[in-house]
Amino acid sequence: METGRRRTIPEVEILARLPLRSIARFKSVCKRWKSVIESDYFRRLFGSFHRSSSTSWSIMFRTEYLREMTQAIGFHGCKTWDLPKSLVSYIMPFQEYPNLPTSEYYYIASSNGLIWIDVLVSRIKNKVYSYKSFVGNPVLQEWVEIPQPPNPWVQDKHPWYPSPYSGVGMVTRVENGVVSSFKMVRTVQMELIDRRDEGMYLWRVCVYSSETGLWTFKQVFSSRPVHGGRVDSPVNLNGVLYMWDRYMFSNGPGVLVAHDFYGADDQCQVIPLPGANDEHEHEHDDEHEHVRRCLTTSGEDVIFIEVIHRILKAWRLHNKESERWQLIWEVVMPSFISDVNCFPLAMNPFDTYIVYLWDRQHGCLVSGYLQAQEFIVHQESENGSSSEGDCCRVNTSGTEGYMEERCDGVLMLSQFVLPSWMDSVPRPPN
């Protein structure tokens, strides 16, 4: 019988099997470990060991004035990161300003694991407040302070103090699975539209790039107005911001106004939304006044969801260039769900079989497993487990506060999804 030698597993392999929260601690042990962990080889090795693991995420509301930062539902404790608590709990207390009231932190947007927050740091005069902006990864407690945008009104004697409501959204560039840069988009003025010229609307924005560390002004043209100052954050995917618009007095779904902030084009693309009550027909038809809609993403797809009288439909943007939508779900929901006050919130960031809804009549959050047509009612701060042992946290009281005045329109909540690797926050050159 052949006798074999006992094989020892290299230290690097042992380390790569740990969750990212544990690996992050080893980076500070010594320069050698830091160099090993930040290498491409180690990142690929970690990915091979955790290929079937999920990552943590939260469905977030964009913070409204005098409200606290709120998530509707979140999953944590996954094997990739092994977090003991929800993602939003890592944002506050904010390490840069730990003693500020929670109502003075504004969640603006998220993209590929990075979040943008504005912090109200002081009152200047005449009820004008001073804000600071930060982009970072709250779990790693790694933040980059963003300089203030330049004053667009150079001849104005009064300085320009951008408010959190001028923040439109954030986009990122991913190379080889790692976030290499980000851009932040602010509107120049609250009216958003400066003028209408030859049938085209002019949208003036100020864009910050982590590649240069500078804000630059940009003019973008669109055949429909860009309402970037709405309560919700625009949906972002692959460098593109998707914003919503609809003609006044219309009950139809409206259109998406999309722009690629990493592209060279200065034109927005207008994409008609599918669903009940076409924009140009039955504009005063009350039959569809209780249609509830949301725009979300799942995987690499933009998803549009519509609920009317317990019938849920979901479409995938099949081809952005041709503006084609593909119907992927049509499901009749059970009778215990409200027939007129059920609002779709979002789709699972990784699974198009799972959707999340808010039942305003009963004040509860509902998850729907569409393939099995099973719907589950969740209670406040419920802790549940998935097949992988992920922890679920539901915030019904916070969601109720944000949803109590919702009626029509297209809801767009922000998906804060941790990456499958602990990318460093892109920083501008010195």
From Swiss-Prot:
Pfam families per record: b-prop_At3g26010-like, F-box
Residue ranges occupied by any F-box domain in the UniProt entry: 1-45
SUPFAM superfamilies: F-box domain
Name used for this protein in its record: F-box protein At1g49990
Source species: Arabidopsis thaliana (Mouse-ear cress)
